[in-house]
UniProtKB/Swiss-Prot annotation:
GO terms for cellular component: chloroplast. Gene3D superfamilies: 1.50.10.160, Farnesyl Diphosphate Synthase, Terpene synthase, N-terminal domain. Substrate binds at K145, K364. This is Ent-copalyl diphosphate synthase 1. Its EC number is 5.5.1.13. Keywords: Isomerase, Magnesium, Metal-binding. One of its GO terms (biological process) is gibberellin biosynthetic process. It comes from Isodon eriocalyx. Expressed in germinating seeds and leaves. Involved in the biosynthesis of ent-kaurene diterpenoids natural products such as oridonin, miltiradiene, eriocalyxin B and nezukol, known to exhibit antitumor, anti-inflammatory and antibacterial activities, and in the production of gibberellins phytohormones. Catalyzes the conversion of (2E,6E,10E)-geranylgeranyl diphosphate (GGPP) to ent-copalyl diphosphate (ent-CPP). It holds the Pfam family Terpene_synth. Pathway: Plant hormone biosynthesis; gibberellin biosynthesis; Secondary metabolite biosynthesis; terpenoid biosynthesis. The lineage of its organism: Eukaryota, Viridiplantae, Streptophyta, Embryophyta, Tracheophyta. It catalyses: (2E,6E,10E)-geranylgeranyl diphosphate = ent-copalyl diphosphate.
Length: 710
C-alpha cells in the first residue's frame, strides 16, 4: 500500500464532479458537455434516498451540497428527469435539517458554495426551500468570510478563496490566472478549476481536469492531489498504531518525499502550493524532526498573528481542533531556544484545554471515532512521558479505521490513511506482543520468588511496575532480551538499594557486599557464601549477569560479561549518587547488538565517540533530576506537576537538549540511530515515573499489560 503512493488515494466528490459536468464544450455546433463521463458518473451514483454524498456517513451539509450540485448538473443538460425529481424531493424534505447540524462539521467553503449553487438553481427554475433559519445563517457566514479577504486582496495574492471560486460573480480572471497553481488548477480544487475553465477556457485548467477525470473514471475528488497529506498522515497512523517497524523502508521514503517538498514557509496538502496551512506544516515538521531532518521552527512564524494567535489559514472563520492538536504535538519536539514553539505550545494547549472543558472537541476537518480521547491523551500525557505501548493501547481504541471520514468541500475518504486493514493488523500485533509480555511477566514472578527478592524489600507491586515500564518502552517481540535485561537490572537496582537503605547496613557491610560481588565466582554461590543473607543477594546478581551474558553469547557470539560487570561495579560504588540511568543505558546498549544495523560496537568504541558521551552525560543528568523529583513527590505527597506538564525549568530545558542530541544527525556521524534512541527511551521512562501519579500508572498497567484489544 505504501509503496504504491502517488498523488493520493481519495474518494470521489459528487459536488465537484457536478461542477465539472457543467462545463460546456466550446468546439462549436450544438451545445454539449465538455466531460460527458462526469454526467455518467452522476447518473450512476445517486443514493437510494435520492441524494448524492458519502454513503457511510450522513451529514446534512454534505448531502444537501452534493445533491443540489448534481440536480443542477442534470437539469442543466435536461437529462435523467426522474433522478432530478428524486433529488429535489430529498432537498425539500431535508433542507430544514440544516438548522440542526453542528456547525463545526460544515464543509470547507460551504458558506460560499451553497449560496452560489442556489443562485444557479433559481435560474434553472429548480424549486427548493430557501427561507430556513439555517440558510440565513449560512448567508451571514458568507458575508463574514468574503469581508475577511476583500476582493482586491484575493486578486493579488494566493488565498484559500482560490479553492472556492465556483459561482462567484465579478471576478477578474486576468488577475486570477496569475495565481493559478503549477498543475493548472486553482488551489487543487476541481470545482473551482471547472468554474475557471467555464469562464476563461484556459488550457491549464482543461489539462488539469482532463487528467483527473481520466484517472477517476468520470468523477473527481474534492481536492487533488493530496500527496503530502497522504504521505504524512499514513506514517502518523502507522506509528501511533505500533506498526511502523514493519514498514521502515517505506516510511523513510515517505518522509524523504515530504522533505523534498518542504519550504521555509511550510507546506499544505499538495506539493508546489502557493498557500500553506498549519496542520500539514505541523505534522510535517514533527515527522521530519523525528526522522532526523533539519527543519527550522521559524516556519511557524508564518502562522502567528500580530496579536499572538496561531492560525491555520489567513482569513479563516473558525479554528480547527485538529490543526491546534497537531501544532501542540509538533511543539513538544522543541529544541533549546525555540521560543516560537514555546508560544505555540502555550497557545495550542490553552485552546485545546478550553475546548475540552466546554465539551466542544468537534473538528471541522474530520469526523473520527474518538477525537476527545486523542486530544485528552495528548494533554494528559505529554510526549516526554508517553511510553510507546501506552500511546498505542489508547490509540487502538480511538482509531476508527474505515469509519473515519474527512471533511473538505464534501465528506471524503483517505483509504491509505484510514482503513480497517491497519486496524486489524495493529490489534493482532498488539495482542501477540501482550501475550508474550504476560508470559515474560509470569517468568519474572518465578524468578522473583526463586531469588527471595521480597526478603530484601522488593514488593510485588514494584516488581510489576518495573517490568511494565520496560515492556511499555521496549515492546517488540524480537527485543525480548533487551526488555528482560532492562527489567531485571531495574529490579535488582531497587532491591539492592532497598537492602542497603532499610536494613541500615554499615559502610563496612556495604563495602563487603561490593567486594564479594567484585570477586564473584558463580560456583561460590551454589551453597551460599560467608554471610548467607548478603551472599544470597550477591549470588542472585552474579547468576543474573551470567545468564544475560550467556544469552548474548549464544545469540550473537559476543561476550559482554566483563563490560556488564564493570557497569554494575560502577553503580554499586556510587549508588547513593544516582547512576541508575547509566547502568540501564549500558545494559541496554550491550544487549541490543549495536542498533538497527546490528553492527556491534564495543564499550571502548562507544566511549570514544563524542556524540555517545554527550548523550550519556545529558541522559544521566536529566534522569538523576527526574528521580530526585519523583522521590520528593513521594515523600512530600504533592506529586503533581502543573497543568502544562512542567517539573522544573531545568528539567524541561535538559529534556529539550537531549531530544536535540538524539534526533539531529550529521553526514559524518557513525553512531547508530537505534543506540541514540535508547538514551531518549530511558529518559522518557524516568519522566513518565516522575510525571504520572500512582493511580494513573496502575490504570495504565492494567490496560497495557492485561486488557486485550477486542
Amino acid at each position: 500500500m505504501l509503496q504504491s503512493m502517488g498523488d493520493g488515494e481519495i474518494s470521489i466528490s459528487p459536488y465537484d464532479t457536478a461542477w465539472v459536468a457543467l462545463v460546456e464544450d466550446d468546439g462549436g455546433g450544438r451545445r454539449q458537455p465538455q466531460f460527458p463521463s462526469s454526467l455518467e458518473w452522476i447518473s450512476s451514483n445517486q443514493l437510494a434516498d435520492g441524494s448524492w454524498g458519502d454513503a457511510g456517513t450522513f451529514s446534512i451539509f454534505d448531502r444537501i451540497l452534493n445533491t443540489l450540485a448534481c440536480v443542477v448538473a442534470l437539469r442543466s443538460w435536461n437529462i435523467h428527469p426522474h433522478k432530478t425529481d428524486k433529488g429535489i424531493w430529498f432537498m425539500k424534505k431535508n433542507m430544514c435539517r440544516i438548522d440542526e447540524e453542528n456547525l463545526e462539521h460544515m464543509p470547507i467553503g460551504f458558506e460560499v458554495a451553497l449560496p452560489s449553487l442556489i443562485d444557479i438553481a433559481k435560474k434553472l427554475e429548480i424549486d427548493i426551500p430557501t427561507q430556513t433559519r439555517g440558510l440565513q445563517e449560512i448567508y451571514a457566514r458568507r458575508e463574514i468570510k468574503l469581508k475577511k479577504i476583500p476582493r482586491d486582496i484575493m486578486h493579488q495574492v494566493p488565498t484559500t478563496l482560490l479553492h472556492s471560486l465556483e459561482g462567484m460573480a465579478g471576478l477578474k480572471w486576468e488577475k486570477l490566472l496569475k495565481l493559478q497553481s503549477q498543475d493548472g488548477s486553482f488551489l487543487f480544487s476541481p470545482s473551482s478549476t471547472a468554474f475557471a475553465l467555464q469562464q476563461t477556457r484556459d488550457h491549464g485548467c482543461l489539462k488539469y481536469l482532463t487528467n483527473h477525470i481520466h484517472k477517476f473514471n468520470g468523477g473527481v475528488p474534492n481536492v487533488y492531489p493530496v500527496d503530502l497529506f497522504e504521505h504524512l498522515w499514513a506514517v502518523d497512523r502507522l506509528q501511533r498504531l505500533g506498526l511502523s517497524r514493519y514498514f521502515q523502508p517505506e516510511i523513510e521514503e515517505c518522509i524523504a518525499y515530504v522533505h523534498r517538498q518542504w519550504t521555509e514557509k511550510g507546506i499544505c496538502w499538495a506539493r508546489n502550493s502557493q498557500v500553506e496551512d498549519i496542520d500539514d506544516t505541523a505534522m510535517g515538521f514533527r515527522l521530519l524532526r523525528l526522522h532526523g531532518y533539519e527543519v527550522s521552527a521559524d516556519v511557524f512564524r508564518h502562522f502567528k498573528s500580530d496579536g499572538g494567535e496561531f492560525f491555520c489559514f489567513k482569513g479563516q472563520s473558525t479554528q480547527a481542533v485538529t490543526g491546534m492538536y497537531n501544532l501542540y504535538r509538533a511543539s513538544q519536539l522543541m529544541f533549546p531556544g525555540e521560543n516560537i514553539l514555546v508560544d505555540a505550545a502555550r497557545f495550542s494547549a490553552n485552546f485545546l484545554q478550553l475546548k475540552r472543558a466546554n465539551n466542544d472537541l468537534l473538528d471541522k476537518w474530520i469526523i473520527t471515532k474518538d477525537l476527545p480521547g486523542e486530544v485528552g491523551y495528548a494533554l494528559d500525557v505529554p510526549w516526554y512521558a508517553s511510553l510507546p505501548r501506552v500511546e498505542t493501547r489508547f490509540y487502538l481504541d480511538q482509531y476508527g479505521g474505515d469509519d473515519d471520514v474527512w471533511i473538505g468541500k464534501t465528506l471524503y475518504r483517505m483509504p491509505y490513511v484510514n482503513n480497517n486493514k491497519y486496524l486489524e493488523l495493529a490489534k493482532l500485533d498488539y495482542n501477540n506482543c501482550q501475550a508474550l509480555h504476560q508470559q515474560e511477566w509470569q517468568n519474572i514472578q518465578k524468578w522473583y520468588r526463586s531469588c527471595s527478592l521480597g526478603e530484601f524489600g522488593m514488593t510485588e507491586r514494584s516488581l510489576l511496575q518495573t517490568y511494565y515500564v520496560a515492556a511499555a518502552s521496549v515492546f517488540e517481540p524480537e527485543k525480548s532480551q533487551e526488555r528482560l535485561a532492562w527489567a531485571k537490572t531495574a529490579i535488582l537496582m531497587e532491591t539492592i538499594s532497598s537492602h542497603f537503605e532499610f536494613q541500615q547496613l554499615s559502610r563496612d557491610q556495604k563495602r563487603a557486599f561490593i567486594t564479594e560481588f567484585e570477586h564473584d565466582s558463580i560456583l561460590k554461590y551454589t551453597n551460599g557464601g560467608r554471610y548467607k543473607r548478603r551472599s544470597s543477594l550477591v549470588g542472585t546478581l552474579v547468576r543474573t549477569l551470567n545468564h544475560l551474558s550467556l544469552d548474548i553469547l549464544l545469540a550473537h557470539g559476543r561476550d559482554i560479561h566483563q563490560p556488564l560487570k564493570n557497569a554494575w561495579c560502577k553503580w554499586l560504588n556510587s549508588w547513593e549518587e544516582g547512576g541508575d540511568a547509566e547502568l540501564l543505558l549500558r545494559t541496554l546498549n550491550l544487549m541490543s547488538g549495536g542498533g538497527r544495523r546490528r553492527r556491534w560496537a564495543s564499550e571502548e568504541l562507544l566511549s570514544s565517540n563524542p556524540k555517545h558521551e554527550q548523550l550519556l552525560k545529558a541522559t544521566i543528568g536529566v534522569c538523576d533530576k527526574l528521580r530526585l523529583f519523583q522521590r520528593r513527590k513521594v515523600q512530600g505527597g504533592n506529586g503533581c506537576m502543573n497543568a502544562t506538564g512542567i517539573t522544573t525549568v531545568e528539567i524541561e530545558s535538559e529534556m529539550r537538549e537531549l531530544v536535540k542530541l538524539v534526533v539531529t544527525r550529521s553526514s559524518s556521524e557513525d553512531l547508530d540511530s537505534e543506540i541514540k534512541q535508547n538514551f531518549l527511551t530511558i529518559a522518557r521512562s524516568f519522566y513518565y515515573a516522575a510525571y504520572c501519579n500512582q493511580g494513573t500508572i496502575n490504570f495504565h498497567i492494567a490496560k497495557v499489560l492485561f486488557e486485550k484489544v477486542l
